[in-house]
């Protein structure tokens, strides 16, 4: 009889920080001229997948028939002075334009010869279904967006340039002169 060894994978697991899962956006009409970019001062992102199921009663019990999966992505950020992306996204909602969305996990770089700035991720296309700009006397202006996704998206390797990573969060900077 062969002895089977089991490992507790949690001993080797490492949690992914929320700051390392970034979302980039672009209006599909601008794909030829504009790179995807992050929202400035993002405080929260969320991706929800749901599926309704119809129930059919039989003599032997209920049979469930699943429907199509629905995907929704939300983003919340603090409004940055001069932010053009928020304006573009609001205009895209008003004009029913398709928005491209990339979800990239900066903790999972793709490795290989000649591969740089690629990370495991997902690609989506959809419409903005809700846009909210909230301002009160004590806090910064907050923008919340909800995207209704066409289909369920697709896994792939997402290019996130160093500049885009810097926009998403601080990236290590060395002590040497930058040339600026």
PLM segments and residue spans:
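Short, low-complexity, polar/charged sequence segments that are solvent-exposed and flexible
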Residues: 92-98, 121, 145-149, 165-169
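N-terminal leader/targeting segments
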Residues: 1-13
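Structured, beta-strand-rich domain cores
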Residues: 62-121
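Solvent-exposed edge beta-strands and adjacent loop segments
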Residues: 12-78, 125-141
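Intrinsically disordered, low-complexity terminal/linker regions enriched in Pro/Ser/Gly
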Residues: 157-180
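Glycine-rich loops and low-complexity Gly/Arg-rich segments
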Residues: 50, 98-103, 149-155, 170-174
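Intrinsically disordered, low-complexity acidic/polar segments
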Residues: 82-84, 154-157
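Short beta-strand and beta-hairpin "edge-sheet" elements
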Residues: 45, 104-155
């Amino acid at each position: 009889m062969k002895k089977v060894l089991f490992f507790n994978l949690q001993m080797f697991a490492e949690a992914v920080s929320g700051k390392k899962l970034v979302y980039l956006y672009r209006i599909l009409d601008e794909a030829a001229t504009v790179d995807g970019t992050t929202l400035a001062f993002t405080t929260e992102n969320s991706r929800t997948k749901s599926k309704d199921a119809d129930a059919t009663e039989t003599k032997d019990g209920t049979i469930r028939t699943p429907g199509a999966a629905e995907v929704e992505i939300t983003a919340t950020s603090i409004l940055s002075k001069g932010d053009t992306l928020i304006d573009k996204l609001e205009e895209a909602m008003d004009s029913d334009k398709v928005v491209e969305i990339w979800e990239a996990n900066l903790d999972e770089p793709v490795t290989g010869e000649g591969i740089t700035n690629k990370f495991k991720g997902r690609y989506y296309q959809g419409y903005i279904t809700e846009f909210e700009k909230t301002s009160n006397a004590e806090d910064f202006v907050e923008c919340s967006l909800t995207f209704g996704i066409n289909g369920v998206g697709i896994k792939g390797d997402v290019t996130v340039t160093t500049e885009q990573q810097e926009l998403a969060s601080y990236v290590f900077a060395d002590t040497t002169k930058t040339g600026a």
